[in-house]
């Protein structure tokens, strides 16, 4: 089968012909119909998440097939699989655990000590087929197409969990940093659907701000031409934001947006740009603010976002479908901040 693989750090993905895997036991072979392109794939190709090197520090073994936003049809199942059969259209939770560690036992499989992350340390969906380690990580699609569903498995899961951690309600104000991208537009939709909070979207390009508006943002701020701190203070009548979801965590965002938090505000950190957080420690105590890490999501988050999307309450803003062989172009678009919404590869 054709697969776009990371063979060498810092180099374009390479199209290779590799064997189609054979499922056994609880495994399922999926014929890919859609693979979303995530900013994590930029970091994978660069070979690092901030200062963490994917090979030396995170144990990723090359070559590996990228792509962790996955939807397709079941091609073949192992002999221990129940409830699924050939032809079923499914979305795949790529954040899988081995099942035995402490974190797996408490339902936080995505934090597994020996994770099985498709497209990271297991071969992923930038291919014609992908082998899923366990059928429990599948979700049967009823209303959604594969192209609509694929981005939900990362951008949807990630922002669903981040919104949960933001502890929102209709009285609260949420600021979304990076509001016009795939994660940003998803975060806005989810927050509106589950909380009714007032949402301020921040980005640096007008087309991204338009995407944030379409997703449901009540206010948008162009951080390249406006003072975001004063604008957020104005919108909130001086109170500040009850929560910030930072989808970048860059040096610039972390130097600005922690200071827009209201008392008891929550700063939910999602992005992996690799900057250091520098914040005047007494303010944490005096204002009772919290800095919260949020990494993708667990199986409960996966089922939650899929149910929400199947009910029509959120919809991925897929702006472009591309061929499998165009994976490098799609990653380039993300790396150079040219992508709006979500790009999806269709093998």
Swiss-Prot record:
Zn(2+) 2 binds at residues 98, 101, 104, 112. It is an enzyme of class 1 (oxidoreductase). Homodimer and homotetramer. Keywords: Metal-binding, Methylation, NAD, Oxidoreductase, Zinc. This is NAD-dependent alcohol dehydrogenase. It catalyses: a primary alcohol + NAD(+) = an aldehyde + NADH + H(+); a secondary alcohol + NAD(+) = a ketone + NADH + H(+). Gene3D superfamilies: Medium-chain alcohol dehydrogenases, catalytic domain, NAD(P)-binding Rossmann-like Domain. GO terms for cellular component: cytoplasm. GO terms for molecular function: alcohol dehydrogenase (NAD+) activity; zinc ion binding. Belongs to the zinc-containing alcohol dehydrogenase family. CDD domains: arabinose_DH_like. The gene is adh. InterPro entries: ADH-like_C (IPR013149), ADH-like_N (IPR013154), ADH_Zn_CS (IPR002328), GroES-like_sf (IPR011032), NAD(P)-bd_dom_sf (IPR036291), PKS_ER (IPR020843). It comes from Sulfurisphaera tokodaii (strain DSM 16993 / JCM 10545 / NBRC 100140 / 7). Binds 2 Zn(2+) ions per subunit. Its cofactor is Zn(2+). Its EC number is 1.1.1.1. The modification N6-methyllysine is found at residues 11, 213.
């Amino acid at each position: 089968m054709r697969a776009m693989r990371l063979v060498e750090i810092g180099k374009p993905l390479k199209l290779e012909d590799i064997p189609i895997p054979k499922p056994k036991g609880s495994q399922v072979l999926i014929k890919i119909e859609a693979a979303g392109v995530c900013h994590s794939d930029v970091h994978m190709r660069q070979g690092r998440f901030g200062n963490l090197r994917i090979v030396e520090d995170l144990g990723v073994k090359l070559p590996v097939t990228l792509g962790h936003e996955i939807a397709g049809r079941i091609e073949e199942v192992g002999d221990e699989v129940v409830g699924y059969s050939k032809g079923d259209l499914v979305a795949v939770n790529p954040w899988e655990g081995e099942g035995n560690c402490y974190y797996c036992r408490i339902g936080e499989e995505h934090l597994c000590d020996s994770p099985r992350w498709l497209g990271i340390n297991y071969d992923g969906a930038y291919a014609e087929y992908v082998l899923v380690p366990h059928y429990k990580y599948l979700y049967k699609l009823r209303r959604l197409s594969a192209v609509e569903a694929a981005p939900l498995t990362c951008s949807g899961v990630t922002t669903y969990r981040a919104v949960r951690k933001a502890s929102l309600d209709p009285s609260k104000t949420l600021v979304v940093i990076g509001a016009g991208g795939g994660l940003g537009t998803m975060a806005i939709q989810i927050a509106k659907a589950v909380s009714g909070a007032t949402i301020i979207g921040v980005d640096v390009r007008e087309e991204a701000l338009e995407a944030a508006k379409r997703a449901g943002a009540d206010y948008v701020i162009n951080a390249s031409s406006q003072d975001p701190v004063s604008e957020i203070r104005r919108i909130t009548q001086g109170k500040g934001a009850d929560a910030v979801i930072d989808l970048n965590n860059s040096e610039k965002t972390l130097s600005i947006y922690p200071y827009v938090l209201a008392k008891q505000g929550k700063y939910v950190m999602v992005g992996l740009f690799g900057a250091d957080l520098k914040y005047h420690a007494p303010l944490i105590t005096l204002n009772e603010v919290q800095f919260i890490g949020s990494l993708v999501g667990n199986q409960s988050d996966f089922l939650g976002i899929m149910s929400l999307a199947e009910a029509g309450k959120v919809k991925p803003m897929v702006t472009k479908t591309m061929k499998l062989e165009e994976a490098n172009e799609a990653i380039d678009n993300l790396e150079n901040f040219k992508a709006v919404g979500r790009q999806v590869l269709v093998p």
